[in-house]
Regions:
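Conserved acid/base catalytic micro-environments in cytosolic active-site loops
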Residues: 2, 10-21, 25, 31, ...
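Conserved acidic carboxylate
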Residues: 7
Length: 346
């Protein structure tokens, strides 16, 4: 796999190049110092993957990404700083077609080395992505958004919608959450594999585009109808009963399958607290997080939905649940919101 590394810092170019050195399946074909060089070298070299810094002189990473996706569609993995501005820019990059991102550490070299395997895994997954699927997500115009009718047995927060996703998730979530109506009679819980800070930017972006209220979850917060709660980076999110309420519990328990937040503990907890009132969804993502949790939801007679292969950026997490035989409906991304609304209305 041929990689082009783009960063205005010579130190970061060498650090990232060294990460891939010694891996038999990677070859760093060249490096670039700014977005202009990145666009030119992507055209010339036709790499399998581009790692692209966000903040650069002459042309920044976002403009370079836009041109690359327009002129030479190629899998791109952003390299972002751990700042609010960096997280916001990363959300825009994922919207423009970046496959994934690496959170650039401000610490010692060892900090990058600590996540070496994660970077390599992301890179191996990114090169297999069909970038034609990374067209801009469709945000439903207000006039076309669903209006969920009350009735059909829907009662307050008796039901819960639980969604798990990873690679490609922010774009998939935008497709779904913007189609949920303001009068949604239950809460929505989301686990998106993402570091601290980035989940807040994701929540803010979705909130600005949606009729429902979207926020990063807070400790011991009660679940309210019409609200969407995104698990904060580096925290597992579970549901617990607290008297007559159901509240969100955030913990820093050990990583599960290399993830925190992970989908499985969230799914496990809703299976226990909501049982058959659960509507669970697995979207695009690498690995198998969420499959076992979805199995528990199914065992408790909840309703389960998985995104199909045709629209998944990475068909890993949904595939794992489908292979376990615990999915009621397998549908393309564009049909997921309608399936959710139908299930909540039953």
């Amino acid at each position: 796999m041929r990689i082009l590394i783009v960063d205005d810092s010579a130190f970061m170019r060498k650090l990232l190049s060294d990460l891939f050195t010694g891996e038999k399946d990677f070859v760093v074909v060249d490096t670039a110092r700014n977005g202009k060089e990145a666009v030119e070298k992507t055209k010339l070299l036709q790499p399998d993957l581009v790692t692209l810094d966000v903040e650069m002189p002459i042309m920044d990473g976002l403009e370079a990404l836009r041109l690359i996706m327009q002129e030479t569609p190629t899998p791109v993995m952003m390299v972002s700083s751990l700042t609010k501005a960096g997280a916001d820019a990363t959300m825009r990059a994922l919207d423009l077609g970046a496959v994934d991102f690496i959170a650039k550490t401000n610490g010692p070299i060892s900090s990058i080395q600590d996540i070496r395997q994660e970077i390599l895994a992301k890179a191996r997954e990114a090169v297999r992505v069909n970038v034609r699927r990374l067209t801009r997500p469709q945000t439903a115009p207000i006039t076309q958004r669903s209006v969920l009718p009350f009735g059909g047995g829907v009662q307050g927060t008796d039901k819960i919608i639980a969604i798990g996703t990873s690679t490609g998730g922010p774009r998939a979530l935008q497709e779904i959450i913007t189609r949920l109506p303001k009068n949604l009679p239950c809460g929505v819980l989301i686990v998106q594999h993402m570091p601290p800070g980035f989940t807040r930017s994701l929540a803010e972006r979705l909130n600005s585009l949606s009729d429902v209220q979207v926020k990063e979850a807070e400790p011991n917060e009660p679940i309210r109808p019409g609200w969407v709660y995104i698990a904060p980076g580096d925290h597992h999110m579970r549901v617990e009963r607290n008297g007559g309420q159901k509240i969100l519990r955030l913990t820093q328990d050990p990583l599960i399958g290399g993830h925190r937040p992970a989908v499985d503990p969230m799914f496990d907890s809703v299976a226990q607290t909501y049982g058959k009132q659960t509507v669970a969804v697995l979207l695009t993502g690498m690995g198998h997080d969420g499959a076992q949790g979805m199995k528990k939801i199914k065992e408790n007679h909840g309703f389960t939905i998985a995104e199909d292969q045709s629209t998944s950026v990475v068909f890993g997490m949904p595939k794992s649940a489908i292979e376990l035989g615990v999915v009621d409906r397998v549908v393309p991304l564009q049909a997921v919101a309608a399936e959710i609304i139908k299930a909540v209305s039953l």
